[in-house]
Amino acid sequence: MARAFLFVLDSFGVGGAPDAPAYGDDGADTLGHIAEFCAAGAGDRDGLRAGPLMLPNLSALGLLQIASLASGSLPAGMALPERVFGLYGAANEISRGKDTPSGHWEIAGTPVMFDWGYFPQEGDAFPADLVADICKRADLPGILGNCHASGTDILARLGEEHCRTGQPICYTSSDSVFQIAAHEHVFGLERLLRLCEIVRELLTPYRIGRVIARPFIGNSASNFQRTGNRRDYSVPPPEPTLLDRLSEAGRTVHAIGKIGDIFAHQGTGRDIKANGNAALMEATLAVMDEAADGDLVFTNFVDFDMLYGHRRDVPGYAAALEAFDLWLPDVYRKLIPGDMVILTADHGCDPTWRGTDHTRERVPIMAFGPGIRARSIGIRDTYADIGETIAAHLGIAPGRHGMSFL
């Protein structure tokens, strides 16, 4: 038997998506633009980082070759390694959305071939009858926001009014989401989570992918900050995923971070919560000591997207990548014969791009472990090849989509 470890560097795209123009993302390249900005000094921040982007361990896994495959150019200021010891390539997304569930479900062998529902860009985002039903079911005096917004901006703008009135802040984005921000102490965390459950139920006919609880603390617009108690309420995947097939085969899926929420806890045998990339890596390393033959350890490293991509923070994103790179030797030391690790992403979120939304990009594939031969696997037609590769490695039946690259 064998073990598999799947790490999603949330939003770490490598550009080059052939359908990017259809999404308004022609030229978006998360890795390439971060490297370009860092090489030009625009990725420097006092006390955080400076200079060209330094990712020696990821580079040794083929990251720069991946960038060349995906976008046609090497990242600025980064030197090719003397040798590559990982299997490497990039993948196109065939799901119609560039959102978190679509990316993760496709990675797990289930592309999203239908259109999500979205809320209008102009005017009130949410239908009046939906708002009325929410307020009635949840006994609310009303809601604030009702618009497309950046989460941090709307918190600064409406957080104090929320604390005065008790009305939750409800907003959306270009993704298929309904987000609800509320103060953990003034409104109450449990009350916020119950509200999200109500909204999730009411949104069934709207085909909205996720309801997201965004709890925060603080006492004024100057110091409001989100807490680690975010919760995602996703619709279930449209058909069984790799996780379901593993569970049916008697294997354990260790779902770390927001993986359980993304899959609506369908096929996720063991949910482990952690807040922030460092804590997520710590939890992952601990589980690597415990995982049995045949298990999958599946971790989402959310900070790249949540803290830096959406906030268009190049120095922050670069520093987070460099920190992750430094953790990789700890992963190597945990590996035993039969292990395979795959690093990938679910979409892009170019921190140099206009707006605050995800970007349509190819994603990297880096696979390594004892017995994994270093080579290029080229550009894959779908993220689902990742899930099929894990299925083949763990010895379970193939799914309907994708092809193993082992």
UniProtKB/Swiss-Prot annotation:
Coiled coil: none annotated. InterPro entries: Alkaline_phosphatase_core_sf, DeoB, Metalloenzyme, Phosphopentomutase_DeoB_cap_sf. GO terms for molecular function: magnesium ion binding; manganese ion binding; phosphopentomutase activity. It catalyses: 2-deoxy-alpha-D-ribose 1-phosphate = 2-deoxy-D-ribose 5-phosphate; alpha-D-ribose 1-phosphate = D-ribose 5-phosphate. Pathway: Carbohydrate degradation; 2-deoxy-D-ribose 1-phosphate degradation; D-glyceraldehyde 3-phosphate and acetaldehyde from 2-deoxy-alpha-D-ribose 1-phosphate: step 1/2. Its EC number is 5.4.2.7. GO terms for cellular component: cytosol. SUPFAM superfamilies: Alkaline phosphatase-like, DeoB insert domain-like. Pfam families: Metalloenzyme. It is an enzyme of class 5 (isomerase). PANTHER family: PHOSPHOPENTOMUTASE (PTHR21110:SF0). Belongs to the phosphopentomutase family. This is Phosphopentomutase. It comes from Allorhizobium ampelinum (strain ATCC BAA-846 / DSM 112012 / S4).
